[in-house]
Amino acid sequence: MTFNVEFHPKAAKEAKDMLRMNLELNYDFRQYLEELAEEPYKFPKKKGKLKSCRALYFKVKGNAWRLIFRIIDARDLVEIVAIGPHEDAYSSAVKRL
């Protein structure tokens, strides 16, 4: 089954800003989104306040970044909640849930 992928409005802005920062990431990012749509359950579950979420790890200019998302099975949906450097992504995700 393929899931639809949607962005929280603020996560969409974070994605645009990230891609502006690093244009070479465009192809990789599209691949990440396809992977989320095809196999969202393969990514690790989070704990604590983000226990309903999972995370995809990747690098931007050598720095660790996170794409935090949740799966809404009833709608066959993957909602991207936050994207950013490690700590920023997690704190933003907590505020948006």
PLM regions with names:
Residues 1-32:
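Arg/Lys-rich, positively charged N-terminal/basic patches that mediate binding to nucleic acids
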Residues 4, 58-66, 70-97:
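Enriched for short, Lys/Arg-rich terminal
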Residues 10, 51, 85:
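Residues that form or immediately flank small-molecule/cofactor binding pockets and catalytic motifs
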Residues 23, 27, 41, 79-81, ...:
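Short linear functional motifs in flexible/disordered or boundary regions
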Residues 34-61:
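A short, surface-exposed loop/turn module that caps and links secondary-structure elements
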